[in-house]
Amino acid sequence: MNASAGTKDWYAGRFTQFEEGLNGASQTPLHALRRRGFAAFAAQGFPTTAEEEWRFTSVAPLAATHFHPVLAYAASGFAEPDLRPWSLTGTGGIVLVFINGHFSSGLSSIPPGSPGVSVGSLGAALAHDPALALRYLSPERRGGDAFTSLNTAFLLDGAFVRVGDGVTLDAPVHILSLASSGDTPLLVQPRHLIIAGNGARLSVVETYGGKGPGLYLTNAVTEIFVGEGGAVEHDKLQMENLSSFHVGTTMVSLGGEASFTSNAINFGGAIVRNNVNALFEGERAECTLNGLSVATGMQHVDNHTVIDHAKAHCQSHELYKAVLDGSARGVFNGKIFVREDAQKTDAKQTNKTLLLSDEATIDTKPQLEIFADDVKCTHGATVGQLDEEQVFYLRARGIGQTEARDLLTFAFATDVINRVHVDALREKLDALLHARLRQGRVNMET
Amino acid sequence: MSLLEVRNLHAGVQGNAILEGINLRVEKGEIHAIMGPNGSGKSTLAGVLAGREAYVVTEGEVLYQGKDLLGLAPEERAREGIFLAFQYPVEIPGVTNMYFLKAALNAIRKHRSMEELDAMEFLSLVKEKMKVIDFDQSLLNRPVNEGFSGGEKKRNEIFQMAVLDPTLAILDETDSGLDIDALRIVAEGVNKLRSPENAVVVVTHYQRLLNYIVPDFVHVLIDGRIVKSGGKELALVLEEKGYDWIRGESGAVTADAQEAGSK
């Protein structure tokens, strides 16, 4: 199609421009990876709704816009006060700030180093140790799509977090990605790499937000490696501005007896697609994927998860909830693979959606592909309105009609927030949720 | 002025008449029992008084403290001092008992132009009221009724009643599903909450609750009408002779009611 060809030509032109600016750096292993990424993107193009994985989510508005990849750091008018609404007070942890996908050392806060912990800019880490790229950054092998390929093609910067064997990081690492577009729509593509050694423990919080109403596309990729017996909590708060697009892909590998928890919270964005792909690479590991999407107006929020039980004796738990109002549209697609050798797998998936309006819709699709015989896999999905008997019970005790509705909606949603173990984030999320649930509706303009 | 005055109340659900002309007067300080067989309209009466929207009032009126009750929303009735103890208390996952009760109490206080209680004041009130009903503190921080046993749910209703301190409490089959020990605890709670300033309407199928909550008046509801009223001894006669005795004694009334119901 013309539009598709036009889109590819546009990004091909941007890629050539990018390469020309690299000079000698175009011979590095990293750049070979980028080239592979661009070739994969050019071969696929942006997905259409004809593809099964994108049946319910049209990215046509996004493919029709010529976004400009951001190739270098610029402060873009961001200063310290812009960070305050996003800050997680009292954690005393590391804060890595990215402006339009590029590390800002001035705005970041990295307390004096502790042994076994390296954090900072991925761009800097790759410059220091080019072999990192070959060792860890290879999304294609784990089912990356056109968006991950596009991210790889322009891979420049993002967060780098490595915690050595047996090291516990008490305070969370906060990765704050802020975007700002003027008249030129920007393509913001942070690439985060998080490596937890054997027995290492840490929490990472990713937040995404925009300044001003300008249109941009965040296309973020996060790769997480959890070593044997390691434990990682990954919390993500997506609050892009309401005209912009967010595609986020989180890819996780779990070693034996590792534990990983993802809490993906979505409040913002016009069209949002989140992919969380987890792969068990060792036995007796545990993976928990939780999600909450609160949307209204014309927002479209698509959550795709894949849990690949490639090894035996692993457990996965999944709870995705959505509160949809206005003409918002939700999608949940939860795939669970249980490979032939993955005996004694225990997988549970739940998707619950609360619709506050007649126009809001959800497409929910559990997908279990089980090739082993001694396993326990359950899934369930519910879609509905508030329970009127619960509403009456609250009213019969003196609580007003709309307060009762807000309270019940809040309770439904905060069930996911309660699973966040980073106290400062959980409190922030509760406050954000409270602000959004008013008069029995979802309000995004707060 | 009576606390509650029900005049010729007709009500039904989805076009089916259930109440066919209820008259009832309740004064402060009184306990009234409304007894009747299954399907007689007892829970409908309780529901209409509390403001359940499924019920449609087709005739008659209800005055509460001299004012029209039926025009008020359920929450307004609660704020004016009406409390319905549910036959089937509802589970509310994600909302703790404490949070729920504080929201309810403060909504009521706000309506009465009283200052809202802060967390500390509320906690001390709750601790005091817990003693009334021997309520387990661990249930306070659990979601409302979620995973509670039948007895715990009913006890929670009376605990809420203790905290909200209603002027008119309507207990809808609070005895159903309770063993004798739980029944006694619930009844003792209600008795402790009695005062010359409030009234209780006990809706029940069986007489046994009335051994513990002794009513001043007993009304027998059959086929949507109060067919007989008397003192506490009426409950004992009913226990002995059954509802058929009343049906036989007031056969004409019952026949009328059936005729009206079939229209």
Regions found by a protein language model. Name each.
Chain B
Residues 16-17, 76, 184:
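Short coil-to-beta microelement around the adenine-binding A-loop and adjacent beta1/P-loop entry
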Residues 35-37:
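The feature captures the beta-strand-to-loop junction immediately N-terminal to the Walker
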Residues 170-174, 181:
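Walker B catalytic motif
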Residues 217, 221, 225-248:
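Conserved beta-strand-loop-alpha-helix hinge in the C-terminal portion
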Residues 61-77, 145:
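ABC ATPase NBD Q-loop/coupling interface
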Residues 4-6, 19-21:
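Conserved structural motif at the start of ABC-family nucleotide-binding domains
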Residues 90-167:
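ABC-family P-loop ATPase nucleotide-binding domains
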